[in-house]
């Protein structure tokens, strides 16, 4: 993977990834396909929304269907019929959030897995092997995630352990001699000084990109933005910056404003399944009875499949009947909205009009309360 910044408007950056002839423009939003599928839609439909790179979770795929099944197909790309790049999360967050039993030591984590309840030992070495077998284009290091609002000492200990695992991840990743990329993850909670230490040590190890972990986990938005203001300028300018698990449309705007290049989040797909649909002026809650006889499309500025062929009234009906088609059409629309937003952001950076674009975004967003 090669990465190059081509345009800059203040701190906002526009660049390209080159994955063996597959060109991905940044800033980029990655739909989440945790189990090798973006919920309710096919890979062809994912492409048609404008999505070019997706995220899957190595932790979940390791347990179900398991590496043996995926390797029968060659790799994760073949298994799910996706020709574009795939970034895999190492599973650090899932180990700590899903497990009923979890014991951490310097070598890894012993936990009770959520599929059959068996004790499992996950280490940086195993995580790198899993992601290598999956054929991930971007591999994330194995890290220790902790809850927001932990004290300085606990946060420091977790950050130092993540650094130790980062070194191990680098060694084991390199041993596979593949041409994929490895990203480090900056930790340190809400403490800027710990974030500084984490980043500087990761830079010494030398990764292909740097992710900001442990954010959007309950902290006030202003705290997240302050940390981005603090840490992004310190990340090497020639390396991509990835804000993990974020976010809402306004988070994408504010992340890009601070120099972030990559995002992922379940919000567009999860909200779609719950009838919350993003449009130019805000969010339509399609379950509201006022849409029962509304013959207009979701958003007259949108050219997605859903907006071209279906009315709000029909989408309201599908939701009321709990029809699977409703989740599919809603997901297509929300992902198309996100990818259109990212495309417009990139164009504004190229034209040095990002600030004006963001002002217009907020003006339109707050114009109507749906």
Curated annotation (Swiss-Prot):
The lineage of its organism: Bacteria, Pseudomonadati, Pseudomonadota, Gammaproteobacteria, Enterobacterales. Pfam families: TGT. Belongs to the queuine tRNA-ribosyltransferase family. Keywords: Glycosyltransferase, Metal-binding, Queuosine biosynthesis, Transferase, tRNA processing, Zinc. Residues 245-251, 269-273 are annotated as: RNA binding. Substrate binds at residues 89-93, 143, 214. One of its GO terms (cellular component) is cytosol. InterPro entries: ArchSynthase1/Queuine_TRR, TGT, TGT-like_sf, tRNA_ribo_trans-like. It catalyses: 7-aminomethyl-7-carbaguanine + guanosine(34) in tRNA = 7-aminomethyl-7-carbaguanosine(34) in tRNA + guanine. The active site is at 89 (proton acceptor), 264 (nucleophile). One of its GO terms (biological process) is queuosine biosynthetic process. Binds 1 zinc ion per subunit. Its EC number is 2.4.2.29. Zn(2+) binds at residues 302, 304, 307, 333. Pathway: tRNA modification; tRNA-queuosine biosynthesis. It is an enzyme of class 2 (transferase). Its cofactor is Zn(2+). Catalyzes the base-exchange of a guanine (G) residue with the queuine precursor 7-aminomethyl-7-deazaguanine (PreQ1) at position 34 (anticodon wobble position) in tRNAs with GU(N) anticodons (tRNA-Asp, -Asn, -His and -Tyr). Catalysis occurs through a double-displacement mechanism. The nucleophile active site attacks the C1' of nucleotide 34 to detach the guanine base from the RNA, forming a covalent enzyme-RNA intermediate. The proton acceptor active site deprotonates the incoming PreQ1, allowing a nucleophilic attack on the C1' of the ribose to form the product. Homodimer. Within each dimer, one monomer is responsible for RNA recognition and catalysis, while the other monomer binds to the replacement base PreQ1. SUPFAM superfamilies: tRNA-guanine transglycosylase. The keyword Amino-acid biosynthesis does not apply. It comes from the Bacteria. One of its GO terms (molecular function) is tRNA-guanosine(34) queuine transglycosylase activity. This is Queuine tRNA-ribosyltransferase.
